[in-house]
Amino acid sequence: KNLFIREKTPVYGHNGITYSMNTQWGALNPEKTPVNDCHEMVQDSKGRILLLTNETKNNVIIYNKSGSYVESWGTEFPGAHGLTIQKTGKEDFLFITDTAKHQVYKITIDGKILLTIDAPADIPAYQKKEAFIPTETAVLDNGEFYIADGYGAQHILHYDEKGTLKNSFGGKGEGDQFFDNAHGICIDYRGKTPTLIITDRTRNVFKRFSLDGKLMEIIHLPGACVCRPVIKGDYLYAAVLRSPSLSEADSGFVTILNKENKVVSNLGGSEPKYENGKLNPLSQAEKIFRNPHDVCVDDEGSI
C-alpha cells in the first residue's frame, strides 16, 4: 500500500490508507518515448506496467515495476483511450478503445490485433459510426466483454468472446438507468455474484448493474468526476479527473472506497466525511495531481 521509495516524503490519504509519492518512477526522455495523454495503465502477468497513450509514436509503453523502460509498440491508435487486460492463465490479451477511429480492439500483449469491433449498426443510435466513441471495456472470465460508449451514445454493449453482440442497455437519458457520461466500467467479483460497476462521470456517481443490465444501486460521490472503477482486494480505486465539475481544470485527486461503498481515503483530495449517511462534497485539497484519468494498483499494492 505504499509508493515509498524515498524516506521522509509527504504522506497522502486518510484513515490509515496512506501513500507516499515517488516522482521519479517511469521518468523517460520525452523525445525518445513521448506521451500525449496518459490515459490508462494495467499490470500484466509478468508484473510489467503497461501505459496507454494517444501518442502514435508509441501507443503502449511497457515498464518494469521499478519504472525502467522495457519496450513500446503501437502507431495506429490516434484515439487510444481505454486499456483493459484479460489474463487467461496461459497468456494475456489487451482491449483498447479508440475514440478517434470509433473502434475497439482485442490485441495480443505484443500488439497484434485479433478482433475489431465497430459501431453496432443494428442499434438505431449507431446508424452513423461516428456515434460510437467507446471509452472503456471490461472482460468476464469466460471471455465475454462489455464496452462503455462513454463519449458516444452512452450504451453499454455486451459481446460474446467472438465479438457477437448479445445485449445492450443504458443510453443517454435522465432516468437512473441511463447515462450522461458512461466513461468507465469494471466487473465486481467481491459479492456472491459478479456485477458491473459503471461510471456516470458528469453526474458524480457509480452505478451498479447486473450482468444482464438491470440497475441495482447508485453510489453517490458528490464533487467527484470519477473515471473508471478499479477493484483490488476489498477496495475500489478511481481517478477523479476534476472536481467539482469537468469545467474546473487541474482539480483532480484519487479516491478509494471500501466494499460497503464508503469513501475511506482520498489522495490529494479532501477528507471523506459522512453526515446522516450522506457523503459531504469532495474536492481537491492538495495539488499532487492535475487531471488524473486512471488508477493501476500493482501486485504489491502500490498505485
Residue ranges and their predicted role:
Residues 61, 71, 105, 115, ...:
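WD40 beta-propeller blade core
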Residues 63-68, 108-112, 160-164, 210-214, ...:
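Short loop/turn segments that connect beta-strands within beta-propeller blades
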Residues 23-32, 74, 114-132, 164-180, ...:
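Surface-exposed loop and turn segments in beta-propeller and other repeat-based domains
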Residues 2-24:
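Blade/loop signatures of beta-propeller domains
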Residues 31-46, 76-92, 122-144, 174-195, ...:
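Beta-rich, blade/repeat-based domains predominating
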Residues 51-52, 96, 147-148, 198, ...:
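Residue position within the beta-strands of beta-propeller blades
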Residues 192-193, 222-273, 278:
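Loop/turn-rich, solvent-exposed surfaces of beta-rich toroidal or solenoidal domains
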Residues 54-55, 99, 150-152, 190, ...:
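Short loop/turn segments immediately following the C-termini of beta-strands
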